[in-house]
């Protein structure tokens, strides 16, 4: 494939971003969980809204005579049920986040299926650009090589920009909340001081009247 003039101009930038993007934005991660015979293990991630989440999970059974099964539940920050499976050895869940916050995936071993041994689970958790099926995109749009890599990097840069905006909005929200809290604390302090002054004045008047009645002053 011949490189066009535009592609030649973009290549140095793409080459630089190829090293910067993995550092600046998480692209996905594999998680290993050791689930005890009784109890629950969970993984979570702070994700903004309108982000694609894709995850595969699989039981790794090496020292079990019978393949154990697990139950899985995925919930949103507001407690909405996004994925719920029982008595499975593997599975997948995918969704687009509707709200910003902490998304939680919990796993627990089904009773009498594990022989009182820990159950090992491998979880491939991907979000944002890492969840895209680039092979299908390349096939559908007939792109390959450097052009495909540039498309990936453009998506990564866009994701970074969205993350920066999300962090700025969170910072602004936290600043507003902090200012409101400081204002409330200031008013509470003023009110407390006013109450103390009023109580002190009442005590002075009461003692003055008491001493006058006793003819001590």
Curated annotation (Swiss-Prot):
In its UniProt entry, the species of origin is given as: Arabidopsis thaliana (Mouse-ear cress)
Stretches in topological domain Lumenal: 31-184
Coiled-coil regions, chain positions: 138-160
Q: What is known of its domains?
A: The cytoplasmic C-terminal domain contains a functional dilysine-retrieval motif, which is involved in the retrograde Golgi-to-ER transport of the protein.
Keyword Membrane annotated: yes
Stated name of the protein: Transmembrane emp24 domain-containing protein p24delta3
- Cross-referenced InterPro entries: Emp24-like, GOLD_dom
Primary location class: endoplasmic reticulum
GOLD domain residues are 40-152
